[in-house]
Amino acid sequence: MAYVLTVASNVNMREPSESKESESETSDDAASDDDDEEEEAQPASNAYATLLQSFSTRHAGSDEHRKKRRKLGHEEAPQEDVSDAEGASVYGTPEGDGTVVDPEQNETDDEAADEDDGKEQELEKAYEKHFASPDENELATRLKRIATNQWSSQKLTCGSGTTKGFGVLQIPGEEVQPPPRKVKSVHDIQLKQRLVDNALKKVGNFDQVEQTIAPSIFGYQDLLFGARTVQNAARLRDITCLHALNHILMTRDRVLKNNAKLAAAPDDVDAEYRDQGFTRPKILFLLETKQACVRILDSITKLHDFEQQENKKRFLDSFSQPEDKFSEDRPADFRELFEGNDENEFRIGVKLTRKTLKLYSTFYNSDIIFASTLGLRRAIESGDPKKKDYDFLSSIEMVIMEQADAALMQNWEHAEYVFEHINLQPKDAHGCDFSRVRSWYLDGHAPNIRQTIVLSAFITPKINTLYNKHMRNVAGRLKYTADHTDGLIESLSYGIKQTFVRFDSPSHLTDPDARFKYFSSSVLPSITRLPRTAEAGGLGVLVFIPSYLDFVRVRNSLVDSDFSYASISEYTDATDVRKARSHFMNGKHSLLLYTGRAHHFHRYNIRGVKRVVFYGVPENPKFYDEVLGFVGKSIERAEISRQEASVRVCFSKWEKMELERIVGSKRVGRLVRDRGDVFDFV
């Protein structure tokens, strides 16, 4: 069940300078168009002429037959590439789907494909069933069930101890069919032969959790994985990159084989092979930082051997920085996210040819797009507002969102905006050969064929909404969460009394008002009654506020009060932060208002904290632990006794998901439903 909170979207943080963005987005495709023509034969660019030709009788000679299937629009001059930051398109000249490869490549790849045929039959079946030739009756039935939200479910349990987790597999069919066999290693997923050796070396065997999610990943089902950690991040990255590469090679080989069949077909036979989309890009990686983009590229290049990587130095100069700017005392998840280049506005196209990986290709000439949600939204909205260009997303067949929990700390509206613009019918032809476009693209079913993989450290109501709205795959979907039976609270050893207080909140729509009323009428008066300690005059009360809008509301309410307070938000400049921390530590200010996003972006180590009030339950349970640690260190420094220290958590019944991660699933029901509204833990 999805719990929906009406929390206003946050404002984006960490935007790069315009000059850097311009440098990172300028495409090199225009300069290398001639080289591309030598390596790849593009499909026809006159879409409507080709469509008409496909219905006519083939009575011309072999030259005429080939003309129907080759690019016709060479007379059209390429557009000049200009950076998005300057308000113009970064896409360059549209060149169609682009998965057709030149005759020079046909001979080599066809021989390899023939050798692989016997070994890849099972994989071909999965690809054939989902993408190439789905059964029309079965597809119609499943689409109808999805439209009426009819899913058959099966619960999955795997792992033990810290790796234990639970999954819910849903299929829009009569019943959930178990996978035909266990997927224990890369041997069991029947990769394209050219990926096997590297996959065995770099990925190898799957652990228990990976064995649970691998059938969904390689079976083209949607996956919401809510148990991403620093420890399993690299493995998840390698597995998803392996799947993405495998899909690109599957698509390319299918087109090559069909090209050969078309070339060999008699002139009096009107053969038709629907094996493409409207545009070329097939894979979209939604990433949080430029450094995350570097890690994805590293994974791709270690799984597939490319003879050349064009523009690699330029890419590293713009996207990569040394990953040693934070000391070891910072939390591991913070260092993983923000080490290196933490800019979060970027987008870059990647083109894969027979021997080469080309960075900075134009979107319409790319196989893969790496982007942040902010960067992609600005690419769509650049230029004339009435002529937004999102056609390059029309044929995306796989979306991989790597750190959804971090995206929540940016502006989640960007993620919603991007998903709303994926797989829409294109406004222009872009050189598409409609006779090669798959039927389900033409029928508008691409959103239900697309595979979406979302990786997150935890699941929130907003992520659940994304799952319910945009992850509606005809092959099914799997939601996997970590085990929260005991919750974080059982692992804490501070010995501090923690009081959870539930306030009445009739509706999630009015929850912010009910929360503020409770805080103003109950929490603030109780703070005024707190005794001052003899050694340090300040009360040392830190008020942790997850939402910035709530923070502004509380801060404004204190302006005319008798409280001496300081505040730190994500927008507070460094000088004011130092002043606020200093005055709070020495007791000049009794209250410190501290936002969740300020903690996310900086992980300040705040001294002088003797008591904590959580205005709301943090979505990230690590924040709860770290803020309690402020009090623990005050106790160690003998600034307050363990008996005097306290923690108070204000919550409503709409925060069940956040509570579960802290108090545990075995207790959360009692907290949100019991008649009593005060619950103490030590």
UniProtKB/Swiss-Prot annotation:
It comes from Pyrenophora teres f. teres (strain 0-1) (Barley net blotch fungus). Residues 1-136 are annotated as: Disordered. One of its GO terms (molecular function) is U3 snoRNA binding. GO terms for biological process: maturation of SSU-rRNA from tricistronic rRNA transcript (SSU-rRNA, 5.8S rRNA, LSU-rRNA). Keywords: Nucleus, Ribonucleoprotein, Ribosome biogenesis, rRNA processing. It comes from the Eukaryota. The gene is utp25. Its main location: nucleus. Component of the ribosomal small subunit (SSU) processome composed of at least 40 protein subunits and snoRNA U3. Residues 43-59 have a biased composition (Polar residues). It holds the Pfam family UTP25_NTPase-like. InterPro entries: P-loop_NTPase, UTP25, UTP25_C, UTP25_NTPase-like. One of its GO terms (cellular component) is small-subunit processome. DEAD-box RNA helicase-like protein required for pre-18S rRNA processing, specifically at sites A0, A1, and A2. Residues 24-41, 104-119 have a biased composition (Acidic residues). This is U3 small nucleolar RNA-associated protein 25. It is found in: Nucleus, Nucleolus.
